[in-house]
Design a protein with these regions (language model features):
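Class I SAM-dependent methyltransferase SAM/SAH-binding core
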Residues: 1-31
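Short conserved loop adjoining the S-adenosyl-L-methionine
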Residues: 31-36, 52
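A conserved beta-strand element that flanks and buttresses the S-adenosyl-L-methionine
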Residues: 43
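Active-site recognition of the HExxH zinc-binding catalytic motif
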Residues: 47-50
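A short glycine-rich, Lys/Arg-flanked "PGG" loop and its adjoining helix->strand segment in the class I
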Residues: 55-69
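Conserved class I S-adenosyl-L-methionine
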Residues: 67-100
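Short alpha-helix
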Residues: 112-141
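Conserved Class I S-adenosyl-L-methionine
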Residues: 139-190
Length: 190
């Protein structure tokens, strides 16, 4: 089964071959109307920061997943905080709201959402409170999306080059955080 956001409706014709034989559901990640452990895996990419209670979203994903949860979101790093201060990144995602301020953003209400950025410690603490009897295996990985920047400006090219070197040595400062919660390797704590 695949759960999707209603915005996918626009893309279904374009991706029809990928979706043949799949069950699609319009769902609210804050209140998933599925049984516990109903899905093998639950995956989300750049979604949780669009809701008002992202911790509840992770709680629900954890509840309905039998084997694991994959979350790809923004990383709360020193570099990202600095980027927000100097306006290289958004603290509130104004770019996600349409020009008429009718859709996009927080809960698709036309209000710019706060870009919630995560840390390893925050995820670990959340899982300890959600499921205190199990010690979860969590794999964290870091990446950046600077490779998507296409520019002929020599200064931008130099900045990107040195950013790649910096991120090689300081991997956890990158802007993307992947979190895989492997429920198959959970150990009993109590």
């Amino acid at each position: 089964k695949i759960t999707y956001h209603k915005e996918l409706n626009r893309n279904i014709e374009n991706n029809y071959n990928l979706l043949v034989g799949k069950n699609l559901f319009d769902a609210d990640v804050r209140n998933l109307r599925f049984n516990d452990s109903e899905f093998d895996y639950v995956i989300t990419n750049a979604t949780l920061h669009h809701i008002d209670v992202p911790h509840v979203g992770i709680s629900e994903m954890y509840r309905v997943a039998k084997k694991g949860v994959l979350i790809i979101e923004s990383n709360d790093s020193l570099i990202m905080r600095l980027a927000c201060k100097i306006k290289l990144s958004e603290e509130f995602e104004e770019s996600s709201v349409d020009r008429h301020k009718k859709t996009g953003g927080l809960l698709d209400l036309g209000i710019p959402n706060y870009v919630y950025r995560w840390t390893e410690r925050e995820i670990s603490k959340l899982l300890k409170s959600l499921d205190p009897s199990n010690k979860n295996t969590i794999i964290f990985d870091y990446e950046n999306d600077l490779t998507n920047i296409k520019s002929k400006n020599p200064l931008i090219k130099i900045i990107i080059f040195f950013s790649k070197i910096f991120f090689f040595f300081f991997k956890k400062q990158q802007n993307c955080l992947s979190i895989f919660i492997d429920k198959t390797k959970s150990l009993k704590r109590f």
